[in-house]
Design a protein with these regions (language model features):
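Hydrophobic small-molecule pocket/channel-lining residues, especially in calycin-type beta-barrels
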Residues: 2-9, 15-17, 22, 26-249
Length: 249
């Protein structure tokens, strides 16, 4: 090959590589834009069918609760075992012994406690599932529509959850919890028979009105319900949140 032809060949190869790179970048941009819009709050890939409420976005509980109460403001209906366990935890906390709180050892917050932290979280809703991505300890909940995808799960910190719609309300039913988490920061207990129902309704584009119903015959005399409000946080980024197990340092 002559020097002139060699130069032309190199230019042709370079041009081809640039074209390939441009195509790849464009493809990535298209995929990225199809998952989330510029503010990160509008999914276009696998988005819910027309007419289905879309809860995708970043949300924050503006009134995080240290101690959960029922919808009428009363104390949860603890039974004798529940009162004894709660009193023991309260005494430890008041004495300054915070290592009794599972979160102090970097265990997961559990449900519904995750919903009452002062940290934001992302809801990503698709035609297949609903995903909650929490800033708190980078906790992730993958919730399928209507039924679980596999065998009966083992007990876990977050339980096993399925979602369905009740009109315009998103309903999430969870069970199969272990007993290693607290329901709130004050130490409300639960056992492995715990079931949790979350209900979320978009009352306007920036507000979710929610409720959480707790059923646990091991520690409560009856099911009870508490409420929460979530506010949309467009443009807010989820920060890195690394748990440091100070009890072992």
């Amino acid at each position: 090959m002559t020097p002139g032809n060699d130069s032309q060949g190199r230019q042709a190869v370079a041009g081809a590589l640039v074209a390939m790179a441009s195509t790849a970048v464009l493809g990535l941009l298209c995929v990225g834009s199809s998952v989330l819009a510029a503010d990160g709050d509008a999914p276009l890939f696998g988005q819910p069918p027309a007419g289905m409420p879309n809860f995708t976005g970043k949300w924050l509980n503006p009134k995080p609760a240290g101690h959960l109460r029922t919808t009428n403001g009363s104390e949860p209906p603890l039974n004798a075992a529940g009162k004894a366990e709660y009193a023991k935890r309260q005494a430890a906390l008041k004495s300054g012994d915070h290592k009794v709180d599972p979160v102090s050892s970097c265990l997961l917050h559990g449900v519904p406690r995750l919903l009452y932290t002062p940290l934001p979280f992302l809801i990503l809703q698709t035609s297949r599932d609903v995903n909650f991505v929490h800033e708190a300890n980078h906790t992730f909940r993958n919730i399928y529509w209507d039924k679980l995808p596999g065998d009966e799960p083992d007990p876990s910190y977050l339980g096993a959850s399925v979602a369905h719609l009740d009109g315009k309300t998103l309903v999430i039913d969870s069970a199969d919890f272990n007993d290693l988490t607290w329901l709130d920061y004050s130490g409300l207990p639960h056992g492995e028979k715990l079931t949790v129902q979350e209900r979320y309704t978009l009352i306007d584009p920036a507000t979710i009105q929610g409720s959480v119903t707790i059923t646990d015959p091991d520690f409560y005399t009856a099911p009870w319900t508490t409420r929460l409000t979530l506010k949309r946080q467009p443009g807010m980024a989820l920060a890195e949140n690394v748990c440091m197990d100070t009890q072992r340092m």
